[in-house]
Curated annotation (Swiss-Prot):
EC number from the UniProt entry: 4.1.3.1, 4.1.3.30
Residues holding Mg(2+): D172
Keyword terms of this UniProt record: Glyoxylate bypass, Glyoxysome, Lyase, Magnesium, Metal-binding, Peroxisome, Tricarboxylic acid cycle
PROSITE patterns, sorted: ISOCITRATE_LYASE
Record flagged with keyword Lyase: yes
GO annotation, cellular component aspect: glyoxysome
Disulfide partners: none
Active site (UniProt): C210
Biochemical pathway: Carbohydrate metabolism; glyoxylate cycle; (S)-malate from isocitrate: step 1/2
UniProt keyword Transferase, yes or no: no
Family: Belongs to the isocitrate lyase/PEP mutase superfamily. Isocitrate lyase family.
Protein name (Swiss-Prot/TrEMBL): Isocitrate lyase
Chief place of localization: other
Amino acid sequence: MPYTPIDIKAEQEAFEREVAAVEQWWKEPRWRKTTRIYTAKDIVQKRGTLQIHYPSSDQAKKLYKLLEEHDRNKTASFTFGALDPIHVTQMAKYLDTVYISGWQSSSTASTSNEPSPDLADYPYDTVPNKCEHLWFAQLFHDRKQHEERFRMTPEERAKTPYTDFLRPIIADADTGHGGITAIIKLTKLFIERGAAGIHIEDQAPGTKKCGHMAGKVLVPIQEHINRLVAIRTAADIFGSDLLCVARTDSEAATLLTSTIDHRDHYFIIGSTNKDLQPLSEVMFQAEQRGLLKVMLAAVEEDWTKKAGLKLFHEAVIDEINSGYYPNKQALIAEFTTKVHPLSNTSNKEARALAKKLTGKDIFFDWEAPRVREGYYRYQGGTQCAVNRARAYAPYADIIWMESKLPDYAQAKEFADGVKAQWPEQWLSYNLSPSFNWNKAMSVLYQETYIQKLAKLGYVWQFITLAGLHTTALAVDNFARDYAKIGMRAYGQQIQAPEIENGVEVVKHQKWSGAEYIDNLLKLVTGGVTSTAAMGKGVTEDQFKDDKSKL
């Protein structure tokens, strides 16, 4: 006997209506490039009876429309990592999206309050909390502006600059902070807290590094696809148009967790010296003999020199070149035509082809060089990233290859490689502050680099840590001069330029919403309040007669 009486027919009809609504939703042009491995019925079964509309989905629609326009025009949305409400309100005047960096959050905003480098070892609600912080600020300043404008006449509004404070936010989901269920929960957090899009990378969660650190460990291709599917599943369950950005760190990766996915086989390094013990055994024996630190490193270096480490196709080419084979170049061409970075040939198939061409079982052991943590050695590169990006494309709105340098030729190689299979795929580019921009290119080239990338299809570009660096520079300059010349530093280097440039934060009480709150108080008290923050005696009256842009 059920606790609550329910009309089964009405329940079934409601379910079927919702399934039909989801199917209709998925027919929208926004989803024409998206692959789903489940049905609308599967999704509706996972929903509750109360459907909540999340404003972040409206922001996602706005973001998608914005990027569509950039794609048509061969332009780009370019932005940077925001730290706080000051950043987002100032960015909103000039930039059309906002980025939230896991790196910045790790160093400045962990929910544990413990600073850290970018290892994604902070509590997994850290970036969602920062997202909510900035999203609430956007909503507040939008309300404040709306209230101020509608205290004006239409003629006054026409003369008053308008700022769209609701710039879509794209946030850093790192590796998802765990398995599939963790990713689903993390995605829900981002949807609830204002994200229009999130990005997730193909590193292993326990060893995640900043994209510009060494020692990156990848997960197999299918494991990352599962993450992308998990994000879309969560977004579908919660009725969100959330954009998914798939990042690959394979360009500079050196390790892989597993050989299970044949699409990774081409890039796995093996030993070609059959007389050596596996490295892990050699290192264990050295430790048992009491060797430490430098001596252990020497043992590993000696083993590595003797191992003949290479990729399987390199071992095949070396065998053909060193052996007694007629038509060597023809043999190499036949092998490399069928086994190449984008062929997704399994090692078993590659071995069979090599034996057919050479008559030999070529020795190649990818187990022997495994590092002490158990990972396989891996040789990434641009074509490796292209191969992964092609696999991720059906499950992601945007693809991002993390790179070591701001190299246009490499960016073009990646874009061309992805678009050869997926011509309409949107791409993203990290204009990283880890690059030495003044060594990488001329000042003139710096000015046009974003536009050059946009023409290749990089529709969303961002400086991950510009919020951090601009804040550091401004505070360092002011603190140094303040120590030397006192209030002259503030008056001449901060306040005067604020007034001259029309930076509204110079009237910080008004910027923070004091007038808006006063008007709320008056609304509640019938129009009169003796405790108005901006009443007689407020010090911002000193700025009223200032001949400025404010």
